Amino acid sequence: MSLKNKIIGAIAGATLLGGGITSVVKHNEGYSESAYQDSAGVWTICYGETKGVKRGMRLTKSTCDTLLRKSIAEHAEALTGLPESLPDVVVLGSIDMTYNIGVYGFKNSTVKQLLMKKDYAAAERAVLAWRYITINGKKYNCAQYVNGKPNKVCWGLWERRQWQAKAIGNRYDSIESAVNALMKGQGI
């Protein structure tokens, strides 16, 4: 079975992996039934949905949950070609990263190339290179402190990357420990 089919089955069958993926994406993306512009100015709704979103859009929680399951399945496409034997925790981190940077971004990333070789330590380091965002043409380093404090522009993205790095680096014992670390803010 391919990783994509494993993920789709996990989401549909409410397995531990499926529940973990859903919990992580919901936690990291947040929820809004009304369209809003994210920190990069992209119109967003539900749990980070951007496709076809316009100002003034509103969707129900039920519709958002359906879109989330569909979107996770679409993002699983980026894991095509990875070894089917990847640990579930690595799959969890990879799906969350793909959900954030997009299918194209993950498919063409050094992270994916390293995971194809099962080099988890190098893949973990490569995740942390994804720490920049551009807003109105200005590039921000999300890992940077300003006046001794975490920056206010995108520190949350940096915290997400640190958690993803540990998951992709296979440094959690289980799906539960990875999800619990994230929920308790211990992913960083």
Q: Residue locations for each model-derived region?
A:
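Extracytoplasmic
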Residues: 40-42, 89
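Long, amphipathic alpha-helical surface segments
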Residues: 1-11, 19-40, 49, 53, ...
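Active-site nucleophile-His-acid catalytic modules used for acyl/amide transfer and hydrolysis
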Residues: 73-112
